[in-house]
Amino acid sequence: MKPSTKTNVLKDSADNLHDQSIIDTARKVLNIESQAIAELGNRIDDQFVNVVHHLNQCKHLVVTGVGKSGLIGKKISSTFSSIGLPSLFLHASEASHGDLGMISEGDTVIAISNSGETEEIVKLLPVFNRIQCTLVGMTGNMESSLAKQSDYVLDVSVKEE
């Protein structure tokens, strides 16, 4: 068997960096992240309060997304389950292949898409409406299809990723 020819990009990059540049980069990333959190905090408004009240009455929660939004959705779903709100994650790409049966009338769906135009999410919007579930959109684009078709919308936009 041949030895792997893959290179460890992180290791190779770190070997070529000076200790101070590593520290500077880490601090820069943390500053960007903390700024984004502070800005998000400034956007908490009545819509957020309405979502909290709705979730407090919710019997079953489904969280959906694709890619990084999907990974975030998995964590959100897990956290809600941990605090006693029955929740599951539905991968938007898998939904149309038999998984839509997980959603029933009266359920709440949190759909996460930074653009609000993710194809897999947009295709599900009419289905959510037909099932008559409550839709909470989390998006960085308040003019998107997701924002316009959600019962509640949370602005999760960021300046820099």
Positions of predicted regions on the chain:
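Short, motif-level signal for alpha-helix interfacial/capping segments enriched in acidic residues
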Residues: 9-15, 130
